[in-house]
Amino acid sequence: MMKGVKIEILLLLSVFFLACGNRNEENSGKDLTVMFATTTGLVGDGYNEPILKALMESVSAQPGITVHLLKPDNLSEARSQFNDWLAGADERKALILCGPEFEPLVDGVNLKTGRIMLLDSDKTYGGGISTALLKRYGGAWLAGAIMKDFELVLLKGLDGDRIIDEISQGIEDGYSDNGGAGFQKCVLSTGYEGLNMADELYSILWEQEVVKLFYSYEGLIVPVCGSSRLGAFNFSWRYYATIGIGDDCSPYTDILPFSLVLDLGGIVREYVSEWVQNSSWPAHADYGMSTGHVYISFNGRFFQNFASNNESWPFSLDAWTALENQYKDKALEKEAGYAY
């Protein structure tokens, strides 16, 4: 299955570069640079990959744009690439920085020409720099609430990352606030390698007592761990059932009742569209459940092909949907009240 996902990415890249080469007079000269997060990969991570896909879709619909994709290994390399972009900035150039780790790059910058968008920042800079914040807590709380009748094993990539902490805390709070009583948490690492250890995670799931949950259909794996989640999806093909976090994860495994979609790609798509149309970007904008950028996506194949044929599986799609509707308004309140 992982091989198929990689092939999909390669096909999308082919379309992407063909689109970039198809010049048209209206967009000729427009130059877009996207710097991806350093802490995880481009494939399978739930952060960079959805942004990459949205970018390719946007550019293929707007031929004539020159696009540069940057994936620095660390913040020092990112700063060097950022300074190079600043040195050549002009009115037809835009830069999208994918992640709050890049906040130090724009501190103190007063952009004279061109434009910059910093994703996942709650700061307001002005001076030609826009920020956008995706609020994840409410959607994570909702996901935890609708899983209240299961035992959960939450696989957390690391402690101390703002986004990982927000998602994990939201799931745990939604679960416990609504009577869930079987919560386990496993922190994979003390550093960002916890977001890039799919093989090790598979071994952890196999070796630990967690595997016993799945013989009785009482447990759900919840991977909040970047591309390490691929190990959980691989495990779920052989045992039982995983929740998707980040994007629609149903292409990875059918044994997945739902995904918590955090639509970073949709945000990037909107900003690219506004830039192409020469519309201004706001100094700051918030996104989340309230804007339709965070939502539950149920996996129809799971309920049609698996749950309906397993009498031990306790919940129908209608039952899950009813729980979502029951807790959605409260989740929106949680989104609005969380200290981001």
Give a label for each model feature.
Residues 33-54, 58, 68-75, 100:
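Extracytoplasmic "Venus flytrap"
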Residues 270-340:
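Hinge/cleft segment of the Venus flytrap/periplasmic-binding protein
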Residues 18-19:
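C-terminal motif of bacterial Sec signal peptides marking the signal peptidase cleavage site
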Residues 107-134, 248-254:
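Flexible loop/hinge segments that line or gate small-molecule binding clefts
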